[in-house]
Regions:
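Structured, helix-rich domain cores that form ligand/interaction pockets
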Residues: 1-256, 271-314
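Helix-turn-helix DNA-binding segment
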Residues: 261-266
Length: 314
């Protein structure tokens, strides 16, 4: 009994949580994890017959803030800066890239605003595809003491708060095809938007996907593990110390051989009763149809015979 109490006490000192743990699913939080697209960038070209129509309305619509314009170009913000559109046919031809780029956050658009973006811009484009998709999970769990690890070799950057606990973690590099952010969403809402979350804890796990990774959005975290390792399940104190050092000193991983890295990563997964990534995959599976249909709606070939429930002001 005394050994068990000592074990739990040491576990609290090392990990910040008790050794008696339950998975997110067991805690009844699974249905409270939300998943959505937090940013979308659609690129393509104008349907030739629609170019002049769009340009004329961009220059006259009071919901659009025109920043630059010319014979075959324009830049604008729409819907109170919720949407950014850039079009430059000459530059696209000279640089071999798409003519028009439409950027927006679906979470910030109401249904009527979403329809406005569709009708004004997306429905008038051809050869549409995604150059960027941000997939975001909002998790009502305190991720300060979770250990995040990838099976792949990726750069990791961690920023700590005043309590010396992690507040933001980055995996990868910004211009890569996949860039991962994990941060304290509750704190961000309070400091940036002056909003209070109803949850005791709220963290965001966000995948910024570019180029070819936009086609693999539903597989973007198959190599990622968000874990609660149980150090004390390892009998050898020397082995405990090595794993603790690797998990708390990022640079330590660069000092060991590849085969040793594989062995210790495997060991960390084995001693973790909870892998939050499993819960994220379950949530994504349940929402996959809805998310797929949403993406399809942005790039589907459309016709201008649709009726929309908004006033198209000129």
């Amino acid at each position: 009994m005394e050994n068990e109490e000592n074990r739990q006490k040491l576990d609290l000192e090392l990990t910040g949580h008790s050794n008696s743990r339950l998975s997110v699913a067991q805690l009844g939080l699974l249905e409270r994890i939300s998943v959505s697209f937090d940013r979308i960038t659609v690129v393509g070209g104008f349907i030739p017959e629609r170019e002049s129509w769009v340009k004329r309305h961009v220059e006259s619509n009071n919901r659009i803030d025109l920043r630059d314009t010319g014979y075959d170009r324009f830049k604008c913000h729409a819907l109170d800066n919720k949407v950014y559109v850039e079009y430059n046919r000459k530059q696209a031809q000279s640089m071999g890239r798409s003519e028009i780029r439409v950027e927006f956050n679906p979470n910030e658009l109401c249904e009527e605003e979403n329809q406005f973006v569709q009708f004004m811009f997306l429905d008038n484009m051809r050869d549409k595809h995604f150059s960027r998709i941000d997939l975001a999970f909002d998790v009502p769990v305190n991720l300060e003491d979770y250990y995040v690890m990838s099976d792949k070799s990726v750069k990791q950057t961690v920023f700590y708060g005043r309590n010396n606990k992690p507040e933001t973690k980055y995996f990868g590099v910004r211009d890569s095809e996949r860039y991962i952010r994990i941060y304290n969403k509750k704190k961000q809402l309070k400091e940036v938007k002056e909003e209070e979350s109803e949850h005791d804890h709220l963290w965001r796990i966000e995948f910024e996907l570019k180029r070819s990774m936009t086609n693999k959005w539903d597989k973007c975290f198959d190599d990622l593990h968000i874990l609660q390792p149980d150090y004390l399940s390892i009998e050898s104190f020397e082995e405990q110390a090595k794993i603790y050092y690797l998990m708390n000193e990022i640079s330590a991983w660069s000092k060991i051989e590849r085969s040793t890295k594989y062995r210790y990563k495997k060991k960390i997964k084995e001693i973790s009763e909870v892998n939050l990534s499993d819960d994220l995959r379950e949530v994504l599976s349940g929402q996959h149809k809805r998310l797929s249909e949403e993406l399809h709606s942005y790039i589907t070939i459309s016709h201008h015979d649709k009726l929309y429930d908004f006033d198209f002001e000129l």
